[in-house]
């Protein structure tokens, strides 16, 4: 590699060094060559024709390049004059804020922020240019090779409308870079270019506020002139307020001659103790104030003026005095008068103390959505919003095309016809915008077309007066009360030369839906027209009828009273069908609908209710009979006997043994012994009538009778055929005598047999009902007594059986057998 020449600026002799490392033997010769080389002349210029980077030194030597050898190149050289000085202040100020928050765990106060900003503005130019060159080198690496020359052409203004595509990251999105060495913050590449070349202070999270123009079609474009910042209407108004020359603030104070070199300056303006020839004031870095005084030293009063335009320029591109906070007063600064010269308004200071960039070729760029169809000038500092608003972050700022920004644009526009705050932005019909006046375009005119009143027109008009305003067959949406809207076809034969074809009416009536559709919202708030495209179409007309009728006329939604007179004429609601008619209320119904509603009411009336919404409503009584044939299981009637179910001769239907009985063989007379023991029980109670009636009911679904075991097995001589077995005692019985349950012996231990079918009469129940249990009678437990009881049961008289085999059998009378047993 060919060695390059380096110049040591700090050395007065202007000695040079070679880029390549020489050997030890050639070191003396190199030192002699360096001593004999003369310094460059004062008119020596850069071979790349770059502008002056720094001011001349005391020895008259101009610096070749303020940055290192590896950063030098035509890309950086050509873009460096266009870098804004405010970019250096902004990036370093944001980094200082983050360091302060990490170190002290609190944000910077206003005084510290202003002091840091003043320090950054008074940094050496070499540091600023070196920082800008390094940042441009990073940007060069992230731009595609084919677009590097296009980026230079876009920045210098020769081709600002071309997209510059950057290199995407791993996810295919905009790449982020750090703008400082060892910085803890990364910035989007498009944000960096806007801050560098347009001087707009943006946060690292302001990427959502970027708006791209219509010409920018690539999402990775970093051309700063293709992007603008969407702002609120208040921001645009404040920018216009600061640009106005009439907004200077003038304050008059008595002169303080005690201070010769320094003056006391209050941080907050507006108080009577402010005395300053020139100072930078403000509550924050974004609201820097520049105060200037009159130059007359011997004047009795000091006039302090505040120019917002110079204040903003001081922050964005100028310099401020290096102020030191006073120890005596915390809210004041000690300002040195020798630094006042650094605060004069100079446009060159907006670009890193370098010559200003050449005048760019401004070209009109059409943007859709701008006020009064004006064309926006795409210049270097254009901050106008684009045509399309992104959907993200809509809640944080208004759209550029909103009414608020439209009014602000009118205020911002320069000219003599500037509007006053609070005045209307609407112009009279005879006036038009200033842009149209300048371009010579005709102004907009307001056209007012009065609506004709057909009721007040003269009746002696021509017969074809209404031909263009009405159709022969008109569709209307009718308000039918609480049942929704109904489409109606109205035939108008007035002033018609030709008779309406009957087929049109037939098609309209056949396709008309006369059944009102129920809607979710009340009819009074919703009027549905037939031409609306939704799933609830009230009028179904075929396509042929729509073609024949044409596009003239419109659908009407009349009031309910007018429709009642239209549909129901003298209560004769004939709607082209003999089965459909219109009620007095205006509802269209039919006989089938009425019959269907009546049937639904009967079904609802017969259907039992099982929900207990109110405690006062008595629940329905459960019946032992099935309500419907489809019901397979019905709960039995809960009977409340006088005695407990465990001690009763016949257990309760809801009593269920907790232990499954074992099926054992019973002896011949074991069942009769059980009956005898229960008959001679010491309880001495009488069975209830309802209990016995439930027992002999054939339709009863009690567990005792559903098992197939009945008293007919005992009365018809089937005792000998019973399966012998022992009775099972319930372990959980609460009876004092430990009596057995008859349901266990008869309902579970007896094989299935024909169920008992008896008549539900009082005479049939009287013998069994009159059974009395004697107190203290010894139970018959001997075999002889059991045999005698069995014989008495077999010899008991049986009632005459009816000749009809299907007739119900009479109950067996056991009274004689029991009397013989007692004897």
Swiss-Prot record:
Keywords of this entry? Activator, DNA replication, DNA-binding, Nucleus, Transcription, Transcription regulation
Bridged cysteine pairs (disulfide): none
Any GO MF annotation of the entry: RNA polymerase II cis-regulatory region sequence-specific DNA binding
Q: Which residues bind DNA?
A: 61-253
Q: Which GO terms describe its cellular component?
A: nucleus
Q: What is reported when this gene is inactivated? A: Defects in locomotion, pharyngeal pumping rate, egg-laying, and reduced life-span.
What is the top-level taxon of the source organism? Answer: Eukaryota
Instruction: Kindly indicate whether the keyword Cell membrane belongs to this entry.
Output: no
Residue ranges with Low complexity bias: 10-25, 777-794
A Gene Ontology biological process noted in the UniProt record is: DNA replication
Query: Which residue intervals are annotated with compositional bias (Basic and acidic residues) in the record?
Result: 386-396
- Segments of this protein annotated with the region Disordered: 1-56, 364-408, 433-468, 777-823
Q: What is the predominant subcellular site recorded for this chain?
A: nucleus
Give expression by tissue.
Answer: Expressed in muscles, neurons and intestinal cells.
Q: Where in the cell is it found?
A: Nucleus
Record field: compositional bias (Polar residues): 26-52, 433-447
Q: Which InterPro entries match?
A: CTF/NFI, CTF/NFI_DNA-bd-dom, CTF/NFI_DNA-bd_N, MAD_homology1_Dwarfin-type
Instruction: Please give the family membership noted in the entry.
Output: Belongs to the CTF/NF-I family.
* Main function: Probable transcription factor which recognizes and binds the palindromic sequence 5'-TTGGCANNNTGCCAA-3' present in promoters. Plays a role in locomotion, pharyngeal pumping, egg-laying, and life span.
Q: What is this protein called?
A: Nuclear factor I family protein
Q: What gene codes for this chain? A: nfi-1
